[in-house]
Amino acid sequence: GLNCAFAVIPCDNLRKAFKQNVEGITDDANITGLSALSAAFKKGWKWRDDLIRYLNKNLETLLNAIENHKNASPVVPEATYLLWVSLKNPKRKNLQSHFEKYGVGINDGIEFGKKNNIRINFATNHQNIKKASKRIEAALINL
């Protein structure tokens, strides 16, 4: 990758804790990454706005598929392309394996300390989301 990322953290205490936690884990940005970052800030706003609209359409498709399932509660993301879904009393222990049987790759929340939750990455094309939504619905019905 371009090896160039940053975080804007207004809270002093949180910013200090963040710096301590990433020290030694991340590399410094390289010149190519800095050039790309500069171009993005100068000319990338339309692309960004288009991307946000695209991702929101994907999110809406997923939410429509999930909303009819009383045992699934999605948590609408604030600033990411990862949708968390809380599952009420799933019969299956291995959620990742269950969803894979339906052709959907999810992350089991247990990896992140969130038992009975799944994480869905919706940063893909609309066609994939439409297919995945139908598969997710089937997986939820048989959960």
Where are the language model's segments positioned?
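Conserved core segment of the aminotransferase class I/II
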Residues: 1-56, 63
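Conserved glycine-rich beta-strand-loop-beta hairpin in the small C-terminal domain of fold type I
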Residues: 38, 47, 54-63, 73-86, ...
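A short linear hydrophobic-aromatic micro-motif
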Residues: 71-74, 104-110
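PLP-dependent enzyme catalytic core of the Aspartate aminotransferase-like
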Residues: 97-105, 112-143
